[in-house]
Amino acid sequence: MPVASEEDIVRAICTDKWDGQRAAPSLFKGENTSVSRLAVIPLADHWDLFRKHVENPPERRLEFIGEINVGQLQKIGRGYGDPTELTVEPKPEDWNPAHAEIPQKISRGLANQIVRALKIHPPPNEVLHSARK
């Protein structure tokens, strides 16, 4: 059963997907895109979770967490030039019971629109550098 449109999901934004000013479209391009559900694990707890299981220092460090509402994601997909019906499917993992996937293939153009709609969360208790604003 797909994740409800009222839920919010997050995705780790690591240095390989961040150009210093914005997230790269490759963050969402492709199929079976991994996300995590805030209804299962709160945002504050995702920082440690992503640092332990997504980060791969020194070349891949967690910079930010991007958040989007599932309904907003679906609206972006339906409104895209080549309409795409996006769903978020729960796929719990041992390391992340909040893990889910967007199974549909997302084009670079659609991924660009999704990335622009993300709410970007900086690490807790850290001041953003001017280049990150």
Residue ranges and their predicted role:
Residues 9-13, 17:
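Betabetaalpha-Me/HNH-type nuclease active-site subdomain
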Residues 1-5, 17-18, 23-133:
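Conserved NAD+-utilizing ADP-ribose enzyme module
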